[in-house]
Amino acid sequence: MTTTPCALSYARTKECSVPARGPPHAMLVTHHMTYNSLPQCTKRRRESQSSLSSEEEQIASCIPDTPSPCLFPSTSPMDQLVERLFVEGVAHEVQWNFPSKNLIPTYERERVLEALKERFGPGQSLINQLPSEEPDTLKAAFYNVCDNWFHQMMEAEGYEGKVAANAILRWLRGELNTLVLCGGRLSNAKSLFNALCACFPLAISDSRINSILSLGEIAPHASLYCLPFVDEKPDPLMLHFMEGNAATCRLNKKTFHIPSTPMLIHCADLSLANEFTARNTVVFFLTGDHTKTPPCYHPRKELRDFVANAAACACLMTLHCKRDNKLCNPCIRTPLQNQ
């Protein structure tokens, strides 16, 4: 019997395709022998890959998930409006004169004003009621404090501008409780008084310096207690409150508590300046003609920039030292250190 070449090739192919029969352990041995027969470099490569993958899994488990955008929402239009009104110093309905006011519903307008009253309320220090510094670093680098309205005012009255800024900064922080500005009715003292009052929308003015009943009614609601055109000396109890003390008083058969309240006083009688000497009080003399001083159009920003450039040293006198009449050691040493 003869066999053709095609039949021979078919028989060889069939023979190769038939799986090897045998017990299961023979297949395991064959697999084990096949792995052991691999070169050593191949086995090391596989082991290193497996260890590397496990290290990557450990590192991946330590990396926090990417936060969802909903966890950090952008500032809402209402928050932006509150911040804008805060910078402008708005806390009352009558102060809100922007065109956008009529586009906001009444109930949302009330919510905005309530948020502003909390930021300007008596529980906040005066320094925190000023707008924060602008993020424009280029403007800050080229800012000239000599162009500041408050700095020019103090320099024109004979004070070292930066040293006076330190005293006002301490007053804003609450380290000093009362700021007294001495000068006539048409002097720069009243101009500075007006500018400082305009910086704080919840500052309340009173006409009776020694009325404890009036102070008791105003203090719980005022961020700043203001007294213009004062022409009488404070009595002992008023001096006690000027120091920043809180006290409980009884008047007209009523007992009431008066909290510590920052004060701003315009003393119109220069002969009474010494009567305002007390702890935690600073007195400035500003007798220049107000007509020679330009108006301050942005008092909140001007005051913020003024105290931001304050000197490190502080005058130790209640009647603040002038440039030509320095009485305390820090003020005497300041020009020597600058030379």
Swiss-Prot record:
Residues 40-59 are annotated as: Disordered. GO terms for biological process: viral genome replication. InterPro entries: Parvovirus_NS1_helicase (IPR001257). This is Uncharacterized protein ORF13. It comes from Fowl adenovirus A serotype 1 (strain CELO / Phelps) (FAdV-1).
